[in-house]
């Protein structure tokens, strides 16, 4: 064996050994949102499972602000040693870089680990809206262009883009009314001041079950575990390409060893099989999922392209 070959072999063995011994001290999980937000809760549920499996504390560190970019930037600037992870989500990574300059590069600054949740949205309107299903809803909007308004939690928010995509694919015209958060955006639909929106299942399910809103479908192509009796919009409106929502995942700073990412991904995939975790996610309005680092990387790229396409085609801009 040459000296070079011996060096490479020794390096590989050393890397594997480090991964097998990982973690040997507490791991910090940066959540770029305040406590109690959906990404925060999902990250905590997964962190508990990782802590049980790997016998080290996984400590949640909330770094909220600037639409998630402050915490995201703090995570990517941390040492790539596996001891700082990020509870990543669609807003800061898939959407924000298309709307404004961010201090991180979504294509270069992350080492993907695994998805942990898909966040379905629901098309909702006031119970008095003159339609009983998605096709009737679309037909009514087409017959009344620009008569109706749709709300969102803010210009450029997931709900805004997801509703704009629906409007485009369904070939309907309505006026956008942005709010500061999903709660007031839904309150004015409940009150009859706004026509409709497509907002997270977590935010809408209480209103739907309470009879204050009615729904015509959910946003992913497949039905969601949280409302299995409600068809997808793709199914109900005959829009097979309509397949979109938000996501939550775990990533690490770029440069984190592949072995560490694979180890964490494997533990997350095992955790996601637990029935208690699946039920917890359903109660949060999410679907528990997992994948490999390579699959996560491909998913993140696809989501960036999807949201970027919506922003460009609809000419969406936010005030800087």
Predicted regions, residues:
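N-terminal secretory/targeting leader peptides
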Residues: 8-9, 233
């Amino acid at each position: 064996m040459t000296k070079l070959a011996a060096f490479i072999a020794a390096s590989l063995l050393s890397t594997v050994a480090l991964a097998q011994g990982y973690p040997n001290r507490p791991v910090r999980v940066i959540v770029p949102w305040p406590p109690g937000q959906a990404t925060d809760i999902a990250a905590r549920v997964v962190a508990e499972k990782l802590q049980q499996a790997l016998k080290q504390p996984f400590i949640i560190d909330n770094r909220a602000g600037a639409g998630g970019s402050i915490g995201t930037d703090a995570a990517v600037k941390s040492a790539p040693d596996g001891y700082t992870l990020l509870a990543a989500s669609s807003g800061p990574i898939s959407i924000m870089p298309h709307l404004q300059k961010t201090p991180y590069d979504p294509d270069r600054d992350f080492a993907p680990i695994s998805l942990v949740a898909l966040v379905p949205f629901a098309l909702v309107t006031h119970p008095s809206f003159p339609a009983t299903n998605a096709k009737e809803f679309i037909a009514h909007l087409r017959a009344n262009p620009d008569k109706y308004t749709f709300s969102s939690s803010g210009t450029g928010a997931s709900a805004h883009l997801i509703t704009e995509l629906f409007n485009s694919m369904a070939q309907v015209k309505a006026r956008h009314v942005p709010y500061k958060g999903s709660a007031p955006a839904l309150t004015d639909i409940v009150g009859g001041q706004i026509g409709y929106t497509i907002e997270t299942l977590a935010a809408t399910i209480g209103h739907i079950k309470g009879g204050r809103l009615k729904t015509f479908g959910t946003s992913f192509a497949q039905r969601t575990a949280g409302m299995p009796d409600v068809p997808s919009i793709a199914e109900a409106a005959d829009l097979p390409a309509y397949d979109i929502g938000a996501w939550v995942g775990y990533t690490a700073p770029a440069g984190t060893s592949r072995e560490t990412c694979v180890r964490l991904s494997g533990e997350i995939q095992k955790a996601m099989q637990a029935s208690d975790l699946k039920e917890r996610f359903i109660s949060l309005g999410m679907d528990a999922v997992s994948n490999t680092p390579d699959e996560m990387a491909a998913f993140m790229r696809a989501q960036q392209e999807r949201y970027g396409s919506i922003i460009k085609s609809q000419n969406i801009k936010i005030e800087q």
